[in-house]
């Protein structure tokens, strides 16, 4: 079965994770895909494939004769998607021999524009898959799942060492590795397939933290509010304006970190803001935290102690701190790309993958592309050729590790 056929089947199973849930997984619907993947793995000969109580799918492919001593290589993708634009199953548009121009997304009024996504011109002549403008596509990360499954199918008859496969829940809400069992997985090195263009070999992620800021106002009748009222919503706005506006994500790129306001609620009586803080440099992230703490201190001095409370929690670290000690893993991936006629691309991840956390748990795990682009919204798209090339690259990675 072709990777694209699998992909279309998987995106028909909705799996949005839920950041407001404390369950594991956060959404029961993730089990729907997990059970299907276990059945498919078993049908492909992965007899020990199973899904555990926390919705992690594991499977192992024994080495071919004579390759028993080669390192076990793991392949990982995540089953959940973001919850935005996920109220219905995707209705993908298939555009054969794409002309490199703007693409109207169904009747939604949205247009996939080359000016917004300049790489589109490089996809001319390929089979382009887009949304109809009303949902996500689900390429993040069901294209990765489809590619891994196709690799498993095509491994038959090819010399290879031990191969471990895992599909995780809740990656999109930062919990993809919470209950991941590296002992069950059993790999020495691994790769997540969770990137964009084919040929990506990524080993740098953000350092990350999250901040929640709560504000307590003093709500009195506005007719007698002079020198008494403290409007929590306005204090929240004041706090946000005290932060460096140049560090908002819409103004940053490459190695530039950001402070991103993700949620806000408020009234005169109380208000709440939520932020994510990101930077590839640990010291720069610390400076962003310090800027928030200083703003909080000044507002409490201005409006009275206890007017606002700031809680910052670290989330994950830059996996480059670990992967710098395993250059051979990235070099194998780059060599595989070149062998498959693709120039390897190593750009910093402006986010993270499950591999960022797993690397700090003793499982070096860089990230590979999937052939998809513009994740998390209705402009998501990918190409059949990109997916097929990623299957070829991963097979070559496994072949090289088996030498």
Language model regions located:
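Short glycine-aspartate micro-motif
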Residues: 72-76, 188-192, 212, 365-367
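Midchain, well-structured core segments that form catalytic/ion-binding scaffolds
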Residues: 112, 120, 126-139, 170-297, ...
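A non-catalytic alpha/beta surface segment that caps or lines the substrate-entry region
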Residues: 22-70, 74-76, 80
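N-terminal capping segment at the start of a domain
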Residues: 2-28, 130, 316, 376-377
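Active-site metal-coordination/substrate-binding segment of hydrolases
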Residues: 67-162, 167, 187
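Short, conserved micro-motifs enriched in small and acidic residues
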Residues: 28, 134-146, 226-234, 381-388
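Metal-dependent amide/peptide-bond hydrolase catalytic core
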Residues: 233-403
């Amino acid at each position: 079965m072709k990777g694209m056929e699998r992909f279309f089947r998987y995106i028909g199973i909705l799996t949005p994770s839920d950041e407001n849930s404390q369950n594991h997984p956060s959404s029961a619907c993730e089990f729907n895909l997990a059970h299907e993947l276990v059945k498919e793995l078993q049908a492909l000969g992965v007899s020990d494939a199973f899904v555990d109580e926390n919705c992690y799918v594991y499977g192992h492919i024994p080495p071919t004769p004579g390759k028993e001593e080669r390192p076990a290589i793991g392949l990982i993708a995540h089953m959940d998607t973001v919850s935005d634009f996920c109220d219905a199953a995707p209705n993908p548009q298939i555009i054969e021999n794409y002309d490199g121009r703007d693409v109207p997304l169904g009747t939604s009024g949205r247009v996939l524009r080359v000016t917004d996504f300049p790489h589109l011109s490089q996809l001319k002549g390929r089979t382009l898959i887009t949304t109809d403008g009303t949902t996500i596509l689900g390429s993040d990360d069901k294209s990765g799942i489809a590619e891994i499954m196709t690799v498993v199918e095509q491994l038959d008859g090819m010399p290879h060492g031990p191969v471990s496969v895992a599909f995780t829940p809740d990656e999109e809400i930062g919990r993809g590795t919470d209950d991941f069992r590296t002992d069950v997985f059993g790999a020495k090195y691994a790769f997540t397939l969770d990137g964009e263009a084919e040929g990506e070999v990524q080993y740098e992620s953000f350092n990350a933290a999250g901040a929640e800021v709560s504000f307590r106002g003093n709500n009195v009748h506005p007719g007698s509010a002079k020198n008494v009222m403290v409007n929590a919503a306005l204090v929240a706005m004041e706090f946000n304006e005290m932060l460096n506006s140049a560090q908002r994500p819409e103004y940053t790129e490459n190695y530039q970190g950001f402070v991103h306001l993700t949620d806000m609620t408020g009234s005169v009586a109380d208000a709440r803001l939520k932020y994510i803080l990101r930077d590839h440099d640990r010291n720069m992230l610390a400076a962003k935290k310090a800027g928030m703490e200083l703003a909080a201190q000044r507002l409490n001095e201005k409006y009275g102690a206890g007017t606002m409370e700031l809680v910052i929690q670290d989330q994950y670290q830059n996996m480059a701190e670990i992967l710098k000690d395993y250059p051979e893993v990235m070099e194998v991936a780059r060599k595989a790309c070149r062998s498959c006629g693709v120039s390897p691309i190593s750009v910093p991840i402006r986010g993270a993958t499950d591999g960022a956390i797993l690397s700090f748990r003793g499982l070096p795990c860089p990230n590979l592309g999937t052939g998809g682009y513009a994740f998390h919204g209705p402009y998501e798209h990918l190409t059949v050729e990109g997916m097929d090339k990623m299957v070829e690259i991963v097979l070559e990675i496994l072949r090289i590790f088996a030498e």
